[in-house]
Amino acid sequence: MVISMRSMDKSDEEKGKWVLLQAPGFNCATIGAVAMIIIHVVVMSTGGIFPDGAEGGLRSLYIQLGLTWEGVSSGHVWQLFTYFWLHGNWGHLVLNVILFYYSCARLSHVLSSSRILVLFLAVSIGSGLIHISAQAVFDGVPKDPLVGASGGIMGLLLAYFALSPGSRMLLIPVSANNLAKGILIASALLFVATPSLGLPFLSDMGGGLVDLLGPGLFQIAHLLHFAGGLIGWVSIPRFFPKLLTLEDLVRMRNQSEIVAELR
């Protein structure tokens, strides 16, 4: 079963066409979103992963399942598979669930659920490895445990942008290709501008952004977003089969009509 959503592709907008997204059902978009919600409800019902003054149980959950270089290098390799199922608060969860569902639903038109799942897991693990590698190399990278699926989701979103570079998202008047480049550039710049890294000029710029927008700006894992987005963006043409474009279909139809006429 599917539901109709307005297409953000310019040509489709002009023709008034509609694009189909998966409705809730037994598919990767729904299963992944529901799993994130259930896990968060269970965690929050017992106090959350950031309880004030917590000791033992909940804090241990955060330390054991959140991702850090110290944890993985100590043998807690499961953190690479668990960190992206936990979220810090409801706002964090809701945003990630919406983007996860949107990305999976769009990708489901050209990729199977199993391939979308493989892509999500590969991007989540790959971006997580890059994040903790930076923790090991740079003293200024926060050493707090990382939680959240945004790295993998960024990979899914930019994978969709790579498959449909001319499409447009609601309220964002640029092509998916340019939006993907903008996201990658912004994420990279925000990472290198992190004040705690102490990079000349860039850290000063980051300090100015903190004064303007608040310290929460650099509590976001910008390197994770950059790494996840880049992996998703470049992996589609390299590791997935070439997808048929509208031009390919038109050419195939014309060829079949010519063959039919010759007969």
What are these regions (language model features)?
Residues 52-85, 204-212:
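Extracytosolic (periplasmic/ER-lumenal) interhelical loops and adjacent juxtamembrane/interface segments
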Residues 25-32, 90-97, 175, 179-182, ...:
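Alpha-helical transmembrane segments
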Residues 41-42, 129, 133, 234:
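Hydrophobic recognition helices of helix-based DNA-binding modules
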Residues 1-31, 35-37, 187-263:
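C-terminal transmembrane module of polytopic alpha-helical membrane proteins
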Residues 120-123, 172-187:
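Central hydrophobic cores of alpha-helical transmembrane segments
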Residues 80-167, 195-227:
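Transmembrane helix-loop-helix
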